[in-house]
């Protein structure tokens, strides 16, 4: 359950009070035990839980053995970082409805758990459906399950998020 301060944050961001209940979204607590797994595409260090980090690194190595390069775009995100992503999009003129189709509200992102990764590969634009046409996506579809990862947001998912072929979680 969200604390009063996060309920206030949701109100301040314009997130409807019934957002999570209408979409049947689970609340995710912030992970506290995190380890670094390397920088993302823009050099920002990414972190995951120790278990997720181990599985991610083993998966990246296995993919590399098959000549597939998996790049991390985003791992753990705090509630505050998630709120900042939304603020930036609001400032750029997006509506909260548009934003919430792509970004979960603070408290409802799998990234809070430290067990979700947004994946990219050379030759495909990060965080776009274009990723589904990559060799990396095909490799993940065939192999990610061996490492405990699955694609969370397929087309027409029940939570109302856009199709995210780049988002994989334990």
Specify the residue positions occupied by each region the protein language model found:
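Extracytoplasmic cell-surface/polysaccharide-interacting catalytic and binding patches
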Residues: 1-75, 79-170
């Amino acid at each position: 359950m969200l604390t009063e301060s996060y309920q206030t944050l949701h109100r301040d961001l314009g997130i409807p009070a019934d957002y999570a209940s209408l979409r049947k979204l689970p609340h995710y607590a912030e992970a506290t035990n995190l380890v670094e797994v390397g920088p993302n595409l823009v050099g920002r260090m990414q972190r995951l839980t120790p278990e997720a980090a181990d599985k991610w690194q083993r998966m990246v190595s296995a993919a590399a053995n098959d000549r597939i390069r998996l790049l991390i775009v985003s791992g753990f995100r705090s509630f505050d970082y998630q709120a900042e992503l939304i603020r930036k999009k609001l400032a750029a003129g997006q509506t909260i409805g548009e934003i919430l189709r792509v970004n979960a509200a603070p408290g409802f992102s799998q990234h809070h758990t430290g067990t979700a990764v947004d994946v990219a590969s050379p030759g495909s634009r990060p965080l776009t459906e274009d990723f589904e046409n990559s060799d990396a996506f095909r490799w993940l579809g065939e192999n990610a399950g061996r490492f405990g990862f699955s694609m969370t947001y397929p087309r027409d998912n029940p939570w109302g998020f856009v199709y995210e072929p780049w988002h994989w979680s334990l």
